[in-house]
Amino acid sequence: MNLKDYIATIENYPKEGVTFRDISPLMADGNAYSYAVREIVQYATDKKIDMVVGPEARGFIVGCPVAFELGIGFAPVRKPGKLPREVISADYEKEYGVDTLTMHADAIKPGQRVLIVDDLLATGGTVKATIEMIERLGGIVAGCAFLIELDELKGREVIGEYDYKVLMHY
């Protein structure tokens, strides 16, 4: 199945000069959505994953069904002020400044093998901050999986030695 057939391309969104890749059509098609989830589950199967972690918001959309299929838990990564209990945080660079991500301080137990799942790998800032928090909690990042990678933004360089899978390249 060619998953790119289920990605809408919107020029100049959310601002002039940006090409937005919208995964909504993929999610709206049960066969395509299921296929994408199964591809990530297959990647994760041999990695002995204990927990899936996904950054808001689209990391939830992809990560939760992966965790469900693997029969394991899911831990959300959110912006500050969105999680009700004690959190840890990590800053990351954005185009026009610094932003912060958080996760519950008890989300990952030391030694747990974690799969990070998100819809998009662009500059790598989100995944870098997520890796930092997982490792601070004693987790092992066993892999990362993305629906889409925007190759020209070089996010793979940020991932470095971590294993990862991408379903579509743009």
Swiss-Prot record:
PROSITE patterns: PUR_PYR_PR_TRANSFER (PS00103). Pathway: Purine metabolism; AMP biosynthesis via salvage pathway; AMP from adenine: step 1/1. The keyword Methyltransferase does not apply. GO terms for biological process: adenine salvage; AMP salvage; purine ribonucleoside salvage. One of its GO terms (molecular function) is AMP binding. It is an enzyme of class 2 (transferase). It comes from the Bacteria. Its EC number is 2.4.2.7. Catalyzes a salvage reaction resulting in the formation of AMP, that is energically less costly than de novo synthesis. Homodimer. This is Adenine phosphoribosyltransferase.
